[in-house]
Amino acid sequence: MGLEVGSLCFKLKDGGLTSRTNSFKRDDTNRHQNSPKSTMERSLSFNSWEVPKETKTDSDFEVLETKKSTPNTLNGRNCERIQIKKPTVTPPEPFVFFSPRPVTELDAAATTLQKVYKSYRTRRNLADCAVVVEELWWRTLEGAALDLSSVSFFGEEKHETAVSKWARARKRAAKVGKGLSKDEKAQKLALQHWLEAIDPRHRYGHNLHFYYDVWSASKSTQPFFYWLDIGDGKDVNLEKHPRSVLQKQCIRYLGPMEREAYEVIVEDGRLMYKQGMTLINSTEEAKSIFVLSTTRNLYVGIKKKGLFQHSSFLSGGATTAAGRLVARDGILEAIWPYSGHYLPTEDNFKEFISFLEEHNVDLTNVKRCSVNEEYSSFKSTADEEEERKEVSEEVEIPSEKEERARPVFDPVKRLSCKWTSGYGPRIGCVRDYPMELQAQALEQVSLSPRVSPANSYGPIPSPRPSPKVRVSPRLAYMGIPSPRAVKC
């Protein structure tokens, strides 16, 4: 029985299409296949299909590669395994870091960088600790003030004693008084610029306090500087005070050696720099600012907003006087007692006048501007003195025995004026607070060795009596007792 296989062959002949059918028997299969005169021109088998070489172009490329293997029979048909060639991916050569410096120096540089970062992180935590303990102190004082003014003093069974009357009156009077000695007249930074001083970057306090207000209103459980830099407030960007300006404007704080270049002395009634003995000459374009330290040293420099200001000279320390001046060839022409950082009083201005007179500076033709169109930072003390007299006349003066027995709420005791340096604030002021508040603040910023669950932290207290209050009582001596004077 023969097997007839039909194959179709198409040829063009004289413009026509012809077809042929071939048939052969099974026993003649080998003979026909081996015959060079085989009439079958193309088989239906895929094995014999080949692309003519002349039809290949340069743009052709092989994507699939058919590899012949042992044919598998499936329902009488020959099946072949088709393998897909995977593309070869050559990985990039590893980058070899090359430095002319020896490996030991590179390791030392990496170690230094790590130390600098850890140091900054520690200083930021300490700054947060100072803010937190200050806020805790506010809350303690608010509670004490509430007790003093409570209606319980006027209950039927408990009458207010002369001691408590005197304590309340003294507290009231101290809010308007600035002390008696010259040291007590020294002005420290307002709250917004106190934040600037303890900030490791010394970002301009005018910008910083707007973000402080946002943090205070947020009731966040994170400390302020942590919240601002890497915490929940890192994406806060105020439209009127953008973060780009906040990060750009950083005040330069001078160290002890740098400060000497700005020290001014008086020779023959003229102001000149101690180093170089060059006379001071002010220009209309640049504003000359001055600071008189508590040690009676005068410093003068050019103001650059957001970069160099009154707080730069003493690294945020206390001042006896601060303001602006105009001088030509060392001869003083005008002085303004203006400083947004220190908010000097009229008494501070008088101290500066006294300093100039002691050094034989001719003030006859010097323009003294306490208040003008551009600057008006004076705090009048005349009305305050009258109020103090009225308060002292209204209250009963306690006896010597009662004076010794009254609670220790003494606002006269002052804290140290030196608590920061040009290379970064020393947050030693935290030690001025009671131990209990110190421990709470250290726990809040995760610097305490005590182990306490994180969920036990509540919002950072910020019980400001009014949003308008911009001065920390501990720093500006508004009459709230010093932490050293109260035992919790």
Curated annotation (Swiss-Prot):
Region (Disordered): 20-46, 377-403, 448-472
Compartment(s) where it occurs, according to its Swiss-Prot or TrEMBL record: Cytoplasm; Nucleus
Feature: compositional bias, Polar residues: 32-46
Domain of life where this protein originates: Eukaryota
Keywords of the record: Cytoplasm, Nucleus
Induction, per UniProt: By light, cadmium and lead. Down-regulated by salt stress and treatment with mannitol.
Any one Gene Ontology cellular component term annotated for this protein: cytoplasm
Summary of the tissues where the protein is detected: Highly expressed in leaf mesophyll cells. Expressed in roots, rosette and cauline leaves, stems, flowers and siliques.
Stretches assigned to the IQ domain: 106-135
Molecular function (Gene Ontology), one example: calmodulin binding
Effects seen without this gene: Reduced primary root length. Reduced stomatal aperture.
Keyword Repeat: no
Ranges of biased composition (kind: Basic and acidic residues): 388-403
InterPro entries: IQM
Function field: Involved in the modulation of stomatal movement. Promotes stomatal opening. May play a role in the regulation of chitin signaling. May be involved in biotic and abiotic stress responses.
Oligomeric and partner information: Interacts (via IQ domain) with CAM5.
Name of the protein in question: IQ domain-containing protein IQM1
Organism in which the protein naturally occurs: Arabidopsis thaliana (Mouse-ear cress)
Gene name, Swiss-Prot/TrEMBL: IQM1
